[in-house]
Swiss-Prot record:
It is an enzyme of class 3 (hydrolase). The active site contains 1 hydrated divalent metal cation that has only 1 direct interaction with the protein; all other interactions are via water molecules. Belongs to the DNA/RNA non-specific endonuclease family. Pfam families: Endonuclease_NS. This is Nuclease 1, mitochondrial. GO terms for molecular function: DNA endonuclease activity; DNA nuclease activity; metal ion binding; nucleic acid binding; RNA endonuclease activity; RNA nuclease activity; single-stranded DNA endodeoxyribonuclease activity. Its main location: mitochondrion. This enzyme has both RNase and DNase activity. It degrades single-stranded DNA and RNA. The gene is pnu1. It is found in: Mitochondrion inner membrane.
Length: 322
């Protein structure tokens, strides 16, 4: 899978060319033939007074007097995680959390008392809203799971901000394979002192019926504002207690936003970190040289244990019923 992804990401730049062309014709169509004449601010002359070169320097300071348009990435640091929000897609660019056995063993939060809410940290016109998901057929998929933030009710409540959500396929993904994957990440804390997890959406290209690469994804809401990712990534950075942070154990995974069979090998979704960087535009582990990164899947079995997950859920439900 990783080699196909690497090849496909190189084609994404093609879209930028068509975008420039569209912008040009859109502008001309809007303005008619009255395309602004960028009159030179000053001209160089030779000793005979002949014009040599006209120079136009864009005055950025004057432009910014009208206001700075962005783009803006809304960063929010909560008790259990941080998120960086993409106003264009109404999804996070990424979320980041660190879990330990100690933090997971604190059971002071209960999701029964948590509610999905818009993130008021984001300007209203760019927020994802509850109504955007209503009737869409997609789950409000946590990027940082509520189960990772049980150490306080406030921490758990913060995982229900819509800035921590993306539209996810429910049956076969969010309620199944993705949930098993989250559980597998938590189980890593039995071997490692701390486990840091980056999670986020991707919008990856695929070939159309003409054999051309293109990016297609649904948009939900009214008006349609919230993008439905084609894929999701997780980058896992695990450290053993007492070992230096300069040589962590690392694994990266890219999963499609669609139903996945319970027995499908997790390792088939493993990719180099560079694949996630190229697709997301993020620089990940930039302070950790590649030679210092240990392969997580060489130290642990990168395989989901669905049976254990199902049994643990049944046990929790049984305990809650007492």
């Amino acid at each position: 899978m990783s080699s196909n992804l690497i090849k496909s990401f190189g084609l994404i730049a093609i879209g930028a060319i068509s975008g420039v062309t569209f912008t040009h014709f859109y502008y001309k169509g809007y303005q008619g033939s009255d395309v602004p004449d960028l009159t030179p601010r000053y001209t160089k002359f030779d000793s005979a007074g002949r014009a040599l070169e006209s120079i136009y320097d864009f005055n950025a300071t004057k432009f910014f007097q009208y206001g700075i348009p962005g783009p803006v990435a809304d960063q929010r640091v909560n008790h259990g995680y941080m998120s960086v929000f993409d106003r264009r897609t109404r999804n996070p660019f990424y979320t980041a959390e660190t879990i330990t056995q100690e933090s997971l063993n604190q059971r002071k939060g209960n999701r029964r008392y948590s509610e999905f809410v818009p993130d008021d940290n984001i300007p209203e016109m760019f927020q994802a809203k509850l109504g955007d998901y209503r009737g869409s057929g997609y789950d409000r998929g946590h990027q940082v799971p509520a189960a990772d933030c049980k150490f306080s009710q406030e921490a758990m409540n913060e995982t229900f901000y819509l800035s921590n959500m993306c539209p996810q396929v429910g049956d076969g993904f969010n309620r199944n394979y993705w949930a098993y994957f989250e559980d597998w990440c938590r189980r890593l804390t039995s071997k490692y002192g701390s486990v840091t997890i980056m999670t986020g959406p991707l919008y990856l290209p695929k070939k159309n019926e003409r054999g051309q690469w293109e990016v297609q994804y649904r948009v939900i809401g009214n008006p349609p504002n919230v993008a439905v990712p084609t894929h999701f990534f997780k980058v896992i950075i695990a450290e053993k207690s007492g070992e230096p942070t300069s040589s962590p154990s690392v694994a990266a995974f890219v999963l499609p936003n669609k139903p996945i069979a319970d027995n499908f090998p997790l390792k088939n979704f493993a990719v180099p970190v560079e694949v996630v960087e190229r697709a997301s535009g993020l620089e990940i582990l930039s302070n950790v040289p590649k030679g210092n990164r240990k392969q997580l899947c060489s130290e642990v079995v990168c395989q989901l244990n669905v049976k254990e997950f199902v049994e643990s859920v049944k046990q929790k439900q049984k305990n809650q019923g007492k």
